[in-house]
């Protein structure tokens, strides 16, 4: 495991054990706690094993046994211990996080991603330290899975709290340049490019945002690697964050010269053109994006909005329904679909979409940005 996110000192306690227990079990439980607090790890592991054999329903015992084994890099044994916590559904959340970490360390990346998604669905439970470690590894796996924006949403709060850190810089660089690698296995000749992008992304994520330093690193990235894919698109997104739409559009068009089928750049330009009410150009770009990737939800969303603006309601409904199918957690899609249904006289469907929009917007108001984005991931992964 990586240095910053290496060892977890667990201070998370599950529900207390039953009040009435056999004397022998009670003795073992106290001895295990003493060994753990005195950092006599081998003794603590042995005693927690003995205690869980005497009382298989001992949740604290399984928790501490799993966490101690995890800190000793004994990941398969830790996994087996944490599995016992799933008997009690009220404590699944932290166990999901640890199972994800264990599977990550043993190279079972798809299983780890599934466990982290389950953890998100269970409410992101755990100590601050556990959440930091789990969110970091979750983000790495999202990058590996090609979900770069969602990965950055998870990493950004860590960057705000922890500041400059080489692991976060590397992770943000990979996601920013849309490289589906884990930090330990990308080609070494790409190291500087990833580092420059990561530094720019990290400074842009700070609170308050340090766009001056972000632009400095982005300019260095572009001057050295401006002929490489993803560099101009990344710089365009930075300009977009800064509110510099003209420069953002210029960078997106530069990206299309290098990668004519770059779907995110096509979608970004289509969105900008629609904001300027250039529907014809927006439609052309969005249709190009759909032709390259028919599962790009935002391209269908944009086409639906264009058809709506042109009063072609049936075409708008078809595109927005496709967008909803691909991204059911996007509140704006639901809002635009409600508008179309209302204009078509489909009153009940319009109300259902309006209710869904309000529910999703209310959820956004009470959840941090990574949570709302990753709830969408969980729903999409179920399809």
Kindly give the residue locations of the regions a language model identified.
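Helix-start (N-cap) detector for alpha-helical repeat units in TPR-like alpha-solenoids
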Residues: 25, 59-60, 93-94, 127-128, ...
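Structural signature of tandem alpha-helical TPR/SEL1-like repeats
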Residues: 37-46, 71-84, 106-118, 145-153, ...
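Structural marker of alpha-solenoid helical repeat scaffolds
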Residues: 54, 87-89, 122-126, 161, ...
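TPR/TPR-like (Sel1-like) alpha-helical repeat modules
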Residues: 119-122, 136-143, 148-166, 173, ...
């Amino acid at each position: 495991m990586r240095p910053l996110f290496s060892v977890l000192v667990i201070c998370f306690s599950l529900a207390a054990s039953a009040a009435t227990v056999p004397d022998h079990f009670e003795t073992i439980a106290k001895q295990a706690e003493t060994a753990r607090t005195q950092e006599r790890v081998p003794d603590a592991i042995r005693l927690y094993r003995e205690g869980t054999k005497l009382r298989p329903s001992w949740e604290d015992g399984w928790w501490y046994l799993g966490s101690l084994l995890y800190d000793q890099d004994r990941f398969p044994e830790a996994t087996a211990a944490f599995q016992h916590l799933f008997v009690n559904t009220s404590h699944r959340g932290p166990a999901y996080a640890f199972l994800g970490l264990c599977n990550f360390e043993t190279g079972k990346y798809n299983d780890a991603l599934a466990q982290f998604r389950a953890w998100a669905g269970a409410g992101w439970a755990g100590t601050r330290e556990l959440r930091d470690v789990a969110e970091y590894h979750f983000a790495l796996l999202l990058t590996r899975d090609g979900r770069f924006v969602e990965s950055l949403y998870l990493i950004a709060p860590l960057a705000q709290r922890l500041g400059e850190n080489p692991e976060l810089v590397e992770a943000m660089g990979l996601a920013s340049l849309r490289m589906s690698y884990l930090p330990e296995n990308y080609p070494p000749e790409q190291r500087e490019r990833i580092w420059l992008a990561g530094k720019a992304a990290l400074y842009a994520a700070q609170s308050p945002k340090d766009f001056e330093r972000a632009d400095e690193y982005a300019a260095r990235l572009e001057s050295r690697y401006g002929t490489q894919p993803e560099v101009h698109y990344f710089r365009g997104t930075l300009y977009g964050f800064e509110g510099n739409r003209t420069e953002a559009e210029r960078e997106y068009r530069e990206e299309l010269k290098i990668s004519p089928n770059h779907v995110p750049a096509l979608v970004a330009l289509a969105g900008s053109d629609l904001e300027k009410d250039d529907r014809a150009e927006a439609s052309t770009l969005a249709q190009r994006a759909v032709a390259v990737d028919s599962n790009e939800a935002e391209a269908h969303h944009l086409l639906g909005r264009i058809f709506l603006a042109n009063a072609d309601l049936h075409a708008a409904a078809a595109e927005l329904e496709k967008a909803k199918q691909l991204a059911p957690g996007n509140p704006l899609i639901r809002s635009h679909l409600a508008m179309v249904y209302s204009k078509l006289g489909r009153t009940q469907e319009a109300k259902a979409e309006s209710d869904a929009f309000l529910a999703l917007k209310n959820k956004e108001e009470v959840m941090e940005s990574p949570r709302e984005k990753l709830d969408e991931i969980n729903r999409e992964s179920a399809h």
